[in-house]
Amino acid sequence: MWQLLLPTALLLLVSAGMRAEDLPKAVVFLEPQWYRVLEKDSVTLKCQGAYSPEDNSTRWFHNESLISSQTSSYFIAAARVNNSGEYRCQTSLSTLSDPVQLEVHIGWLLLQAPRWVFKEEDSIHLRCHSWKNTLLHKVTYLQNGKGRKYFHQNSDFYIPKATLKDSGSYFCRGLIGSKNVSSETVNITITQDLAVSSISSFFPPGYQVSFCLVMVLLFAVDTGLYFSVKKSIPSSTSDWKDHKFKWSKDPQDK
């Protein structure tokens, strides 16, 4: 059902001679950016897509079922577990968006991040979120069971440039009043750039710079040879054309 285009969009497509696959795809954004939230949190989903002058409505889908909302923003005032699932949107001049996942959890604490898979040197932003934003203090972020960062008052934890050593299981804990509470554990994965990885596997770290320099020098020499040969070809051709041959009979043919 959600795969059907808006009736108005169909008319516009026919009149303009366009096909559905020619339209841009709509995009769903979360505000705030966290796709894992606690019950009672407020969540706003925004749809970015093209609209026709005649139809500025938006179609929202939750787990492939049409939602009654027709505005560009879909607001959840107090999230519940049954709000979890995939959300998509579509406008009159855009195709159905890719799904965005929303997870609603029950608990005192939740470790949040925009995503759980990062590349080397990406920045990582972690947030230890308490239910209904209850005051939280003496907060510790832990990696693989060991304390990674401590804050007397609750604060977000930033890793400016991720390395492979930052991969692992993470959770946070702290005090709400005198009650010691912890979040569920989540796994963070840091991936290595394939190009860097392939060079590193061939050469030890001490030789990688030398290898790059050799490649640059080989390229420079190869380029110089190319232009040198290219420059000499026209003159050689010209000399060949200007050269005159004289034929003489062999003495015995006389």
Swiss-Prot record:
GO biological processes: antibody-dependent cellular cytotoxicity; calcium-mediated signaling; Fc-gamma receptor signaling pathway; natural killer cell activation; natural killer cell degranulation; natural killer cell mediated cytotoxicity; phosphatidylinositol 3-kinase/protein kinase B signal transduction
Domain of life per record: Eukaryota
Bilayer topology annotation: Single-pass type I membrane protein
Pfam family, one: Ig_2
Basic and acidic residues: bias regions: 239-254
InterPro entries: Ig-like_dom, Ig-like_dom_sf, Ig-like_fold, Ig_Fc_receptor, Ig_sub
Primary location recorded for the protein, binned into one broad class: membrane
Compartments (UniProt record): Cell membrane; Secreted
Region (Disordered): 234-254
Tissue-specific expression: Lymphocytes and monocytes.
Disulphide bridges, residue numbers: 47-89, 128-172
Post-translational modification: Glycosylated. Glycosylation plays an inhibitory role in the interaction with IgG1 and IgG2. Undergoes rapid ectodomain shedding upon NK cell stimulation. The soluble form is produced by a proteolytic cleavage mediated by ADAM17. Repeated stimulation causes receptor shedding, a mechanism that allows for increased NK cell motility and detachment from opsonized target cells while avoiding activation-induced NK cell apoptosis.
Domain Ig-like C2-type as annotated: residue spans: 24-105, 107-189
Residues carrying covalently attached carbohydrate according to the record: 187
Cellular component terms per the entry's GO annotation: external side of plasma membrane; extracellular space; plasma membrane
Marked site: Cleavage: 195-196
Subunit and interaction comment: Forms a heterooligomeric complex with ITAM-containing signaling subunits, either a homodimer of CD247, a homodimer of FCER1G or a heterodimer of CD247 and FCER1G, to form a functional receptor complex. Interacts (via transmembrane domain) with signaling subunits; this interaction is a prerequisite for receptor complex expression on the cell surface and intracellular signal transduction. Binds the Fc region of antigen-complexed IgG with a preference for IgG1 and IgG3 isotypes. Interacts with CD2; this interaction is involved in NK cell activation and cytotoxicity.
Function recorded in the entry: Receptor for the invariable Fc fragment of immunoglobulin gamma (IgG). Optimally activated upon binding of clustered antigen-IgG complexes displayed on cell surfaces, triggers lysis of antibody-coated cells, a process known as antibody-dependent cellular cytotoxicity (ADCC). Does not bind free monomeric IgG, thus avoiding inappropriate effector cell activation in the absence of antigenic trigger. Mediates IgG effector functions on natural killer (NK) cells.
Protein name stated in the entry: Low affinity immunoglobulin gamma Fc region receptor III-A
